[in-house]
């Protein structure tokens, strides 16, 4: 039995034993259960080169800015005023010792360990059902990644049906990915930079009814090829897997997938069904979210098994 299967089974068992029991966290908590991963890994990795776009017809491209470099992003992308939600954003305030923050550092360490074995830059974060905390996990993961000196991250709200990432950041929703995929703006207009150094945000943009058509028209893949050399990590938050097919479309352009499972809530059969939508080689593991803050706070050295990886 795979370790991912074990993680899903444990989540179902916790759900069964706690029905009717109040869980007290004031905000979502990821529980990272892997005791041997306490030490940080900060291995320097070479930046990947941007693929050549010379063979791509200009007619297939959306509106694009010319001369795309990191320096051009700094000078031409709007620096917007963000008002991050203090209930869910763990790394924007002065106190970075809040319950849950260390679990994200552990997740960062695990991702770098996986990255030593396989190419890993474009990371998709999804869940089986709505309200499991995928956007919370994606937003805080992006923040903790840029906490390492010199690391750059772009977080993308690719949930075009029900965008919510902008609310975590307290950032404008438009223009964004949908507007870019429709050819109505270029990267410089759509990508935002806020107060946190090296962290960039591409919101979903306006809500559209044609999300599958936009996500599969090839423009998202071209966009990722165009910007990937500028960032160490690209985190994509997508629609949940069970209700719609959007996540499986976005997965075709990603290197790895994290599945968010909500403790005491996600039925194991639906979690397994969601897991089966993706190739084994892409699914990195499961993040168990929504665990009790009291349980984590009882021991500052407690680490559980929320990330179960196949690599």
Model-derived regions, located:
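P-loop NTP-binding module
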Residues: 1-311
């Amino acid at each position: 039995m795979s370790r991912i299967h074990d993680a899903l089974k444990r989540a179902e068992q916790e759900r069964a034993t706690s029905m009717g029991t109040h869980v007290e966290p004031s905000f979502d908590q990821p529980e990272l259960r892997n005791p041997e991963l306490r030490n940080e890994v900060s291995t320097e990795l070479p930046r990947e080169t941007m693929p050549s776009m010379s063979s791509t017809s200009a007619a297939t491209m959306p509106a694009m800015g010319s001369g795309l470099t990191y320096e051009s992003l700094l000078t031409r992308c709007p620096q917007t005023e963000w008002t991050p939600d203090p209930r869910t954003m763990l790394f924007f305030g002065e106190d970075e010792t809040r319950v849950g923050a260390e679990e994200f550092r552990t997740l960062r360490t695990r991702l770098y360990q996986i990255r030593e074995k396989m190419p890993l830059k474009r990371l998709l974060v999804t869940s089986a059902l709505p309200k499991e905390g995928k956007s919370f996990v994606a937003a805080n993961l992006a923040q903790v990644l840029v906490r390492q000196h010199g690391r750059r991250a772009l977080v993308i709200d690719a949930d075009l049906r029900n965008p919510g990432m902008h609310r975590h950041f307290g950032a404008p929703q438009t223009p964004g990915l949908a507007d870019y995929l429709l050819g109505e703006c270029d990267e410089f207009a759509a990508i935002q930079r806020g107060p946190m150094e090296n962290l960039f945000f591409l919101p979903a943009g306006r809500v559209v009814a044609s999300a599958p058509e936009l996500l599969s028209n090839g423009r998202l893949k071209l966009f990722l090829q165009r910007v990937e050399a500028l960032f160490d990590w690209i985190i994509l938050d997508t629609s949940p897997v069970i209700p719609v097919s959007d996540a499986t479309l976005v997965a075709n352009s990603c290197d790895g997938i994290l599945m968010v499972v909500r403790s005491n809530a996600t039925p194991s059969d639906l979690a397994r069904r969601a897991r089966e939508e993706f190739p084994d080689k892409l699914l990195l593991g499961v993040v168990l979210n929504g665990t009790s803050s009291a349980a984590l706070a009882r021991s500052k050295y407690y680490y559980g098994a929320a990330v179960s990886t196949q690599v």
